[in-house]
Amino acid sequence: MNFAETLERDAQPIIDEIYQDHFIQELLKGDIKKEALRQYLRADASYLREFANIYALLIPIMPDLESVRFLVDQIQFIVNGEVEAHEYMADYIGENYNEIVQKKVWPPSGDHYIKHMYYNVYAHENAAYAIAAMAPCPYVYAMIAKRAMKDPNLNKSSILAKWFEFYNTEMDPLIEVLDDLMNQLTANMSETEKNEVRENYLQSTVHELNFFNMAYTSEKWQFGGERV
């Protein structure tokens, strides 16, 4: 078992919790509050913009040209490709996706997640720390979708089933490259450094759990500080 595989194994209990939580279970059944999906789409639009920016920041510290090309491709995918999955949710809501995300939200859970990733870009010269903070995002979505496609409770007649179909396959190439990078960049690390990278990965998996819950509860700042 390589290093990336151990991270994915260690994250599994958190992913199980994400799958069993309200947001994914109601999405699975094709019966979820429309306001929860609006909150998710608005927060995710903000999140993905920053995700693309972080990819751009990593370009100068990539180990080879192939990795740079990969990051450029991922920026393009975030800008153009992943909108398809969002459109399915917008169709369920019955509103235009671009109109939904015109209202900007910056909820606490999204804020903490994004800052966790930025911190690891700037705090460490080795890109493994930042990649460990970013890699759980596609992995969590892929694992949830693959599990959902085998779940008898999946409402295949709902437009929301297409959301699971999208993530069932679209994340696989990205996960493979991130895993390869993770293994390459941690190969000469000490056990202490590897444990720090592992902690980053697990923290981001918890951030994924909190992000879905943020959408379901329409999480807002309680004492000011909401970003416009």
Curated annotation (Swiss-Prot):
Q: Which GO molecular function terms does the record list? A: thiaminase activity
Q: Where do the annotations place substrate binding? A: D44, Y141, Y167
Q: In which pathway does it act?
A: Cofactor biosynthesis; thiamine diphosphate biosynthesis
Active-site positions, per UniProt?
Answer: C137, E208
Alphabetized UniProt keyword annotations? Hydrolase, Thiamine biosynthesis
Q: What is its EC number?
A: 3.5.99.2
Q: Does the record carry Hydrolase as a key word?
A: yes
Which SUPFAM superfamilies does the UniProt record give?
A: Heme oxygenase-like
Q: Does the keyword S-adenosyl-L-methionine apply?
A: no
- Write down the Gene3D superfamilies for this protein, in alphabetical order: Heme oxygenase-like
Q: Site Increases nucleophilicity of active site Cys: which residues?
A: Y47
Can you cite an annotated GO cellular component?
A: cytosol
Name a Pfam family for this protein: TENA_THI-4
Q: Which GO terms describe its biological process?
A: thiamine biosynthetic process; thiamine diphosphate biosynthetic process
Extract the InterPro entries matched here.
Haem_Oase-like_multi-hlx (IPR016084), Thiaminase-2/PQQC (IPR004305), Thiaminase_II (IPR027574), Thiamine_Salvage_TenA (IPR050967)
Q: Can you state which reaction this protein catalyses?
A: 4-amino-5-aminomethyl-2-methylpyrimidine + H2O = 4-amino-5-hydroxymethyl-2-methylpyrimidine + NH4(+); thiamine + H2O = 5-(2-hydroxyethyl)-4-methylthiazole + 4-amino-5-hydroxymethyl-2-methylpyrimidine + H(+)
**Enzyme class label:** hydrolase
* PANTHER family found in the cross-reference section: BIFUNCTIONAL TH2 PROTEIN (PTHR43198), SI:CH1073-67J19.1-RELATED (PTHR43198:SF2)
- Biological role: Catalyzes an amino-pyrimidine hydrolysis reaction at the C5' of the pyrimidine moiety of thiamine compounds, a reaction that is part of a thiamine salvage pathway. Thus, catalyzes the conversion of 4-amino-5-aminomethyl-2-methylpyrimidine to 4-amino-5-hydroxymethyl-2-methylpyrimidine (HMP). Is also able to catalyze the hydrolytic cleavage of thiamine; however, this thiaminase activity may not be physiologically relevant. Therefore, is probably involved in the regeneration of the thiamine pyrimidine from thiamine degraded products present in the environment, rather than in thiamine degradation.
What is the annotated quaternary arrangement, including any partners?
Homotetramer.
| Protein family | Belongs to the TenA family.
- UniProt name for this protein: Aminopyrimidine aminohydrolase
Lineage summary: Bacteria, Bacillati, Bacillota, Bacilli, Bacillales
| Gene from which this protein is expressed | tenA
